[in-house]
């Protein structure tokens, strides 16, 4: 029996882990046992517990409760906590997701004591080393035994860095080497699985009096925007003026901390500021919006999956396929660019090619892990 430890620390990682956990239970029961460790990097009822319940995955077996802190403090606490668990309990491998401090710390802790690391969403690059996430993903890829990249662009990024999808690049202590796998995207698996379910489980469109393709969904969470008063002001001003000029509602789920930073500026009555939403609620909003405006990588992708164009409120994106397809426009936190991007996307026919696999990435990932551990 293979024994795996899945390590998560933030809400998007719960969503990604749900796809693999579901397939493990449904198709690999009796062959693989999975335990879940939540680092507590981001943990409250809205951000985590609700998602476990909605996604139907087991509550974590471990929670490190590290909480917030500087990058160094948070990462160090997670390394220590993961190392303690991996030395007390035998695991054949560790699955990590994405690019958070939890991802980095888990990869460091596991690799130091020679437990194989399997990185889901490997190979993504923004080429912006000012982003903590860019540092995390680069280091994690170097330490991983299996690198599961969701797109051809991710594969090309890894090949440019010297990784090879066939030959082992380096050897670990157990004599096994690294392997890059073009797996497809587990979030696309989820989008196909949960789309119809969200229509049944959530009534947010009806409850808010919204109509199909007649509102904007905006999400803002990155510190580069939320901790920068000028950026935040530019984004809010652009949303306000778009709502007023185009007579369109803007749904804006905001963390209370970000809401406080808005100040007392007058906002158009069409700006609908609400509390952070559940998993099924965000799906329904993404599916029905005319345009999504976001600084979230995950929301960019989900909008694409559901055929909704996206204004990207960042200076770059890891998901370059979305921009190259014309389904997303990078506007950063620039007032004029946000206005122009919205008007360009709202008024044109947009195509959504199938860049992200066939909806069976999770099965491919698990099969590769089993082959690796034979």
Please provide the spans of the model-predicted regions:
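Leloir-type glycosyltransferase catalytic cores
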Residues: 52, 153, 329-374
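Active-site and donor-binding regions of nucleotide-sugar-utilizing enzymes
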Residues: 5-10, 14-29, 51, 63-175
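Donor-nucleotide binding loops and adjacent catalytic segments primarily
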Residues: 41, 49, 197-288
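A nucleotide-sugar donor-handling region in carbohydrate enzymes
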Residues: 42-46, 143-231, 331
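A donor-sugar binding/catalytic signature common to diverse glycosyltransferases
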Residues: 96-97, 108, 119-120, 147, ...
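Nucleotide-sugar donor-binding patch of glycosyltransferase catalytic domains
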Residues: 273, 304-351
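N-terminal beta-loop-helix "entrance" segment that forms/cooperates
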Residues: 40-58
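Short alpha-helical donor nucleotide-sugar binding micro-motif in glycosyltransferases
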Residues: 82, 86, 284-289
């Amino acid at each position: 029996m293979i024994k795996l430890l899945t390590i998560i620390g933030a809400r998007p990682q719960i969503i990604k882990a749900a796809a693999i956990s579901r397939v493990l239970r449904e198709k690999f029961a009796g062959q693989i046992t999975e335990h879940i460790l939540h680092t507590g990097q981001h943990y409250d009822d809205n951000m985590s517990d609700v998602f476990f319940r909605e996604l139907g995955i087991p509550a974590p077996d471990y929670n490190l409760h590290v909480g917030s802190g500087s990058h160094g403090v948070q990462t160090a606490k997670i390394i220590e906590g993961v190392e303690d668990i991996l030395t007390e309990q035998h695991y054949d491998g560790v699955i990590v997701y994405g690019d958070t401090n939890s991802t980095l710390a888990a990869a460091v802790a596991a690799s130091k004591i020679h437990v194989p690391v399997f990185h889901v969403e490997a190979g993504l690059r923004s080429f912006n080393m000012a982003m903590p996430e860019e540092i995390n993903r680069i280091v994690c890829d170097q330490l991983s035994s299996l690198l599961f990249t969701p797109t051809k662009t991710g594969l090309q990024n890894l090949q440019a860095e010297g990784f090879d999808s066939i030959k082992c690049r380096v050897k670990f202590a157990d004599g096994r080497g690294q392997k890059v796998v073009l797996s497809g995207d587990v979030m696309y698996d989820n989008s196909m699985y949960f789309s119809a379910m969200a229509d049944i489980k959530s009534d947010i469109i009806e409850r808010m009096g919204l109509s199909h393709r007649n509102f904007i969904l905006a999400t803002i969470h990155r510190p580069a925007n939320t901790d920068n008063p000028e950026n935040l002001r530019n984004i809010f001003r652009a949303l306000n003026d778009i709502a007023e000029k185009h007579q369109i509602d803007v749904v804006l789920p905001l963390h209370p901390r970000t809401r406080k930073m808005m100040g007392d500026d007058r906002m158009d009555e069409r700006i609908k500021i609400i509390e952070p939403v559940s998993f099924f609620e965000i799906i329904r909003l993404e599916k029905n919006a005319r345009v999504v405006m976001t600084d979230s990588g995950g929301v960019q992708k989900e909008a694409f999956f559901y055929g909704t164009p996206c204004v990207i409120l960042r200076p770059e994106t890891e998901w370059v396929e979305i921009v190259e397809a014309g389904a997303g426009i990078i506007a950063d936190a620039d007032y004029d660019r946000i206005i122009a991007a919205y008007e360009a996307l709202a008024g044109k026919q947009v195509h959504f090619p199938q860049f992200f696999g066939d909806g069976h990435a999770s099965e491919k990932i698990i099969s590769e892990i089993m082959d690796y551990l034979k």
